[in-house]
């Protein structure tokens, strides 16, 4: 019975130890070494995370002293700063691109950039949580905490890999868009130069004509221009004449209406004054007649 218990204990310890050991993995294509600064910075973050996943004695010691989270913070900031710088560099080359396409690509790239930053932040927070749990050790053994941390790190690592690959693809599309915009700009310049060359050839051909032909051509263009100006002037004069006639008619109508209003205002007043004046004269005459003495008769 004791032998059986011993075998079971050894088997359980071996299983816990096996969970802690990370499986060997090749270097992922998303963090391959390249010439782009942001990929180099992400590669340093990735290498450091692979080292943390070993959960060696040195790793556990630095986890408890917050050394690991501090290192990850620096690597995170370097990576996101490099991504932002590379994105700004590409935006300078996207000027010839249509604004709606440029806005869409920028929005997609910004979302992928945010996801990568959130993944790295989640890794750092999980390691900080492990540090707190190890310091507290509330009802759990160190082996259990390490096994759970190893499992979480494997999941976070896969998520980080997926979002890093997505960001890499978005940046590639962004770069292709910048290249296409630059090609369109070069094509537009080429077309403009060809147009200028064609105009120069036409001017050279015109210069090579005899003086008389050039004079006739200029005279013909000048006559055409004068006729056009004369026609425009006549049309304008006719418009002015019509406008003046309309103004005259309107003024006459307004004057007649005003005269009618004045007549309507003053005729009743004049008629009333006439009646009052006639009444006044009658009253005066009556008063004068009444006050005149009758001549006395002589005997």
Swiss-Prot record:
Gene Ontology annotations of biological process type: acylglycerol homeostasis; cholesterol efflux; cholesterol metabolic process; lipoprotein metabolic process; melanosome organization; phospholipid efflux
Residue span of region Specificity for association with VLDL? 261-273
Give all Methionine sulfoxide modified positions. 137
Protein origin, superkingdom? Eukaryota
**Post-translational events:** APOE exists as multiple glycosylated and sialylated glycoforms within cells and in plasma. The extent of glycosylation and sialylation are tissue and context specific. Glycated in plasma VLDL.
The sequence repeat boundaries are 75-95, 96-117, 118-139, 140-161, 162-183, 184-206, 207-225, 224-242
- In this chain, the stretch annotated as 8 X 22 AA approximate tandem repeats covers 74-245
Residues binding heparin are: 156-159, 219-226
Record PTM Phosphoserine, positions in chain = 141
Chain intervals for the UniProt region annotation (LDL and other lipoprotein receptors binding): 152-162
Q: Which InterPro entries would you find in this protein's record?
A: ApoA_E (IPR000074), Apolipoprotein_A1/A4/E (IPR050163)
Per the record, the similarity remark reads: Belongs to the apolipoprotein A1/A4/E family.
Q: Which PANTHER family match?
A: APOLIPOPROTEIN, APOLIPOPROTEIN E
Task: Report the function annotation for this chain.
Answer: APOE is an apolipoprotein, a protein associating with lipid particles, that mainly functions in lipoprotein-mediated lipid transport between organs via the plasma and interstitial fluids. APOE is a core component of plasma lipoproteins and is involved in their production, conversion and clearance. Apolipoproteins are amphipathic molecules that interact both with lipids of the lipoprotein particle core and the aqueous environment of the plasma.
Q: What is this protein called?
A: Apolipoprotein E
Which species is this record about? Ctenomys sociabilis
């Amino acid at each position: 019975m004791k032998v059986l218990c011993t075998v079971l204990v050894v088997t359980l310890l071996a299983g816990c130890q096996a969970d802690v050991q990370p499986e060997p993995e090749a270097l992922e294509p998303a963090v391959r070494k390249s010439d782009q600064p942001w990929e180099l910075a992400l590669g340093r973050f990735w290498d450091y995370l692979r080292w943390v996943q070993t959960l060696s004695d040195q790793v556990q010691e630095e986890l408890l002293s917050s050394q690991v989270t501090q290192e990850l913070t620096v690597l995170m900031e370097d990576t996101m700063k490099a991504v932002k710088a590379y994105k700004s560099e590409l935006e300078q080359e996207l000027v010839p691109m249509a604004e709606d396409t440029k806005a869409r690509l920028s929005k997609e790239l910004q979302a992928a950039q945010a996801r990568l930053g959130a993944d790295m932040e989640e890794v750092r927070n999980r390691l900080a949580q492990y540090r707190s749990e190890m310091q507290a050790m509330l009802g759990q053994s160190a082996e259990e905490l390490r096994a759970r941390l190893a499992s979480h790190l494997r999941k976070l690592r896969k998520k980080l890999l997926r979002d890093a690959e997505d960001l890499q693809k978005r940046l590639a599309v962004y770069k292709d868009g910048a290249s296409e915009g630059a090609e369109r700009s070069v094509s537009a310049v080429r077309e403009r130069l060809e147009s200028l060359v064609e105009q120069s050839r036409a001017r050279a051909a015109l210069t090579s004509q005899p003086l008389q032909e050039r004079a006739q051509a200029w005279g013909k263009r000048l006559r055409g221009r004068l006729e056009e100006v004369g026609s425009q002037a006549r049309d304008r004069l006719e418009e002015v004449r019509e406008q003046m006639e309309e103004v005259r008619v309107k003024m006459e109508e307004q004057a007649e209406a005003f005269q009618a209003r004045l007549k309507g205002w003053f005729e009743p007043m004049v008629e009333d004054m006439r009646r009052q004046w006639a009444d006044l004269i009658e009253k005066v005459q009556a008063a004068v007649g009444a006050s005149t003495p009758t001549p006395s008769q002589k005997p």
